[in-house]
């Protein structure tokens, strides 16, 4: 893909402007008050983001299409810790990260550049290991809950496309998973705002009490698609994929995404999914396959007639 810096920045402007608009202007000369601000009411499930406006009101008219790509199981430092932006690694005088984790035997394991494109020992991401790694907020349990490979990281040489994009576009260095758990609980959160209390990849017996976001889209006439390579996220609630369920019509193979992007027919919202057996970056997959997949998706979006009014989010 050949895009210059001006094109990159132009594409990122819509997303960046949303952040700036939300922050507003800061003044050091304005009036002050000792009166504490009125606390905002606690948001409840099903509450509206703009309570004074009808449900489904468009508050971002500059953006007509939102494309979401959700990859697998890598931390900010693991992928972007050395790009020089955001809250990444602290680097010593030798240019290497200073981060360490104890191994449980009195030794410190230092962060190191992965010698291969695959984390072959499979850094654990289950509920128990995740909370052991979190270690009450100290993040000192990654090695003892998995192996020393948990301290491995990748660089621009390993992930040229990912790091190249992160060097230009806005990045979220304080974005955390909804549940310190495996894939399916977090994908349930993505489409329904809950994991139904499940902490593993088992299938729930019940549907989410407030439904999934796609049902709200249909209710308000907002177009959507779940474009999948090997399995759709909608399948974390199997009944939605059953023949006759209206949501099953919103699921399409990945080839349809590329066709829709090229034709300028992207829906208002779409989830674009990797092959979970090859290009999702799940351990022990070769991460370069994931980097290539992301390159293909971004290239398709940026080449689309829809691009001037599109926001792409990947995590």
Q: PLM features: residue spans?
A:
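N-terminal pro-sequences and low-complexity stem/linker regions of secreted or lumenal proteins
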Residues: 2, 9-19, 24-315
